[in-house]
Amino acid sequence: MARKNSSLNGSESAELVVKKRVLEESELSDSEDERIEVDGLIDEEASENEAEEAEDDDSDAEFNRLLAEEENGQEEEYNTSDFSEEGDAFSITDKLSNVKLTVIPETSDEGIVRTKYSDGRPRILKSEINPVYDSDDSDAEAKNTIGNIPLSAYDEMPHIGYDINGKRIMRPAKGSALDQLLESIELPEGWTGLLDKDSGASLNLTEEELELINKLQNNQQTDESVNPYEPLIDWFTRHESVMPVTAVPEPKRRFVPSKHEAKRVMKIVKAIREGRIIPPKKLKELREKEEQDSHNYDLWGDAEEISEHVMNLRAPKLPPPTNEESYNPPEEYLLTPEEIDAWEKMEPSERERNFVPHKFAALRKVPGYSESVRERFERSLDLYLAPRVRKNKLNIDPESLIPELPSTKDLRPFPIRCSTVYVGHKGKIRTMSIDPTGLWLATGSDDGTVRVWEILTGREVYQVTILNAEENNDDHIDVVEWNPDSTTGILAVTAGENIFLLVPPIFGFEIENTGKSKIEYGFGFDTFGNVKKSNLNVNSDDEDDGAESHAVKKQVAQWNKPTERQAANDICIVITCRKSVKKLSWHRKGDYFVTVQPDSGNTSVLIHQLSKHLTQSPFKKSKGIIMDAKFHPFKPQLLVCSQRYVRIYDLSQQVLIKKLLPGARWLSTIDIHPRGDNLIASSFDKRVLWHDLDLASTPYKTLRYHEKAVRSVSFHKKLPLFCSAADDGNIHVFHATVYDDLMKNPMIVPLKKLTGHKIVNSLGVLDTIWHPREAWLFSAGADKTARLWTT
């Protein structure tokens, strides 16, 4: 009975669906009538369906069986009252005979039919969509109507779903393997290689889709309604309008910077400075940095930093590579085969370098450095074993170390140019001297002559031949020195072992007579029984035992009258010493003068007295080779210069006062300041040394301006000037202010570098001397000339 009911219900449901479809079609076709009777139509349609169902019982047996199985699960949900005999008494035709359809007039929504369900509820039937011609789905092919059901559910069945009428949709036939191979070789037009999920058939492109794809590939316009070559509309003309469109004057705000915009800009600037607004570029960098930090995890990021120990010393940096270590060094750095052989034969510890420079055409051709491991190992040993000391660096401004010197313009006058050149000598001019009056210049040369020049005009006024240069090549004139007493006019000349005192006939009768008389007074000194004392002794150093020798010393010099030939040349007396006299210096009063004979041993320094014709040797022994000796300007002291030391002796007490240590290898000459508190010394090792006698025995200043041996230094007698001359042919002029305040150090300022003398046989300027009153400088050189340098 249950099966019967289920079959009846299934047939009734199918019958109801078919009748509903027919009813809707009839309503659409007869919509012009307001009310239509549908009883006869439904009966006819039902009878026809019953006949068709009877004929198709065998074909639809399986279909009914499947429907019955599907509805078996729903039998329990239906009430028995729904399947009572009373309900079965009424047919579908009888139920639908009472249904009335109402067509809404044209004033309402078009195509909408309002009706009622069997239970009386309102029902709206909308007409089927009548697509227009431009609709996308107007010409679409019929698709599968199985709904959104995956095809995998029908993999084991011969069909793939059901159509709207409930009939099966069979699976499309598949060709054989040969057909599939042919299809893969000869692809049909529009082939995509895809399967339609609704029908299971191959999905091909239509002609319209193929045409659209071709247009896209060829960069053509896909929409045919768009004209790419429309006529141009000239919105802006190239002709300038003469009259304005409007004559409204421009407002002032067009020409004045906007205050509101300035405020907004300042707000933005302030926000950027405070970090509230980050520029895009910086924001991008921060993001990149964050990403990089996130990828590169710092293993020791959370580790605590341990401060270094106070005594920790960092490893010194490696020295930068030199030209020899280049892969393409200059040719002069490459070793010759002989040098390479010598390098290979040397012990590794004795080699200057531990590699041989090589030259490569390109950096990519440079091989690996074989000594890198060994060098790193040795450096590690040095850092591990070699002691290191922390050296504190002094943060001193270099400019603060340079003293503030006044401008040279404020220190004038000083010589700056050559005014006069005295030409006439045929040999090197070794010495020169200025008359105390400042009018006459005396020069001595290797040609054996002494010449006297008028300073202002440069005219030679006197010449005397002291030596015959052709016969005596060993001796030459070393010193020419005027007597400081301007009333005598005596000129002292040293040549070899002899000292000549002469009075040139250029001063007048009174001065010449006074000078000759002063020289001749000494011959009558012992006429009245006077005894010449020759036992003057000055201790040479503090190590002497102080014992005095009362024995009479041998005569160290002879005072002889000149010969007739010498007297004819205005020579008044000749003093003969044991060795060649190289230096001579007068005492300020003009009665004493000191001479230096470097080769004479303990008699190297002799003091001569003009009024008594007396010569004394102050030292019983000599320490080293004596180079120069001078009297103190106003104290009874004698300054003796040896090769490395300068000693100051007190002649009245006959003791050594001070010993100066210039620090030079070989001193050449000295000169003392007119005030007597400072001394300068020159050396053959290109240095000029300034000593302050009130300070230490070491130099106060060391001047290294010359490039060759310094031959002469000289103080000006009146002005704060001094100079130095050397074999490089240059004369350096300095300003030297000595203060009365003993707490102030002397101020030394370089003023001028005078160049003019030529270098002959590695000899330049041999002697210099200042004018007694003016800021004039005289120089004598190996180029056989003497020069006057003036302001």
Curated annotation (Swiss-Prot):
Biased composition (Polar residues): 1-12
Region (Disordered): 1-60, 68-87
Residue numbers spanned by region Required for interaction with NOP7: 254-372
GO molecular function, one term: ribonucleoprotein complex binding
Subunit-structure text: Component of the NOP7 complex, composed of ERB1, NOP7 and YTM1. The complex is held together by ERB1, which interacts with NOP7 via its N-terminal domain and with YTM1 via a high-affinity interaction between the seven-bladed beta-propeller domains of the 2 proteins. The NOP7 complex associates with the 66S pre-ribosome.
PANTHER family, A to Z: RIBOSOME BIOGENESIS PROTEIN BOP1 (PTHR17605:SF0), RIBOSOME BIOGENESIS PROTEIN BOP1 BLOCK OF PROLIFERATION 1 PROTEIN (PTHR17605)
Name of protein: Ribosome biogenesis protein ERB1
Organism of derivation: Kluyveromyces lactis (strain ATCC 8585 / CBS 2359 / DSM 70799 / NBRC 1267 / NRRL Y-1140 / WM37) (Yeast)
